[in-house]
Design a protein with these regions (language model features):
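Non-transmembrane domains of secretory- and envelope-associated proteins
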Residues: 1-19
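Divalent metal-coordination and catalytic microenvironments
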Residues: 24, 38, 48, 79, ...
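Catalytic metal-binding/acid-base residues of hydrolase active sites
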Residues: 50, 81, 104
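Short, exposed beta-strand/loop patches in secreted or surface proteins that constitute
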Residues: 14-20, 37, 145-148
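Accessory recognition modules or surfaces
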Residues: 51-56, 70-71, 75-76, 108-119
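Conserved beta-strand hairpin/beta-sheet module of binuclear metal-dependent hydrolase folds
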Residues: 19-65, 158, 167
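Active-site metal-binding motif and surrounding structural segment of the metallo-beta-lactamase
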Residues: 43, 54-99
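Metallo-beta-lactamase
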Residues: 94, 102-166
Length: 167
């Protein structure tokens, strides 16, 4: 069977639907998976980097539109399944610290958040590998509880266990 060129080169636009949940908190939907952006005094935290780089570049673009002039400093990752880690390298490349459970650390270091090129569908890290690490941490691993706080807003992140889905 020969795949027609139009089918092989088809692109599918990524659409991000934004819903304000509270002052400075947005649901970024429009696909099978969602992200949440939380505005702090001098940075943004995003929860979840699902699917693939294209989806996450669209989410990042929407966050920049919503909150210009504040960096995305943190990406909170809920678990290690492929549909939840597709954009982790994208956030790593823009200098965000990845917050995840400590059980994910070895897998992410070995297979995901490294500078090895992705050859089937090259991402930003593959195409433009950094010459040096971004300022700040690459990871924050948590065991039970973690707080992001800047004095005016606090976000509490908890490890909910036991959930066999994410173990």
């Amino acid at each position: 069977m020969v795949v027609p060129d139009k089918v092989r080169s088809a692109t599918f636009p990524v659409h991000v639907e934004t819903q304000a949940l509270a002052d400075g908190v947005w649901l970024l939907g429009g696909a099978s998976h969602n992200s949440v952006a939380v505005e702090f005094e001098d940075f943004i935290a995003v929860v979840e980097a699902p699917l693939d780089e294209e989806r996450n570049l669209a989410v990042i673009e929407e966050v920049v539109r919503l909150v210009p002039n504040k960096p995305i400093r943190f990406l909170v990752n809920t678990h290690q399944h492929h549909d939840h880690i597709g954009g982790l390298r994208t956030y790593m490349h823009i200098g965000a610290t990845i917050i995840t459970h400590w059980k994910n650390f070895d897998f992410y270091n070995r297979d995901v958040l490294n500078y090895a090129p992705w050859t089937l569908s090259p991402d930003m890290v593959s195409l433009w590998p950094p010459t040096e690490l971004a300022e700040g941490y690459q990871y924050e691993t948590i065991r039970e509880n973690y707080w992001l706080n800047n004095g005016t807003r606090s976000m509490h992140i908890s490890y909910v266990h036991p959930l066999t889905h994410v173990e």
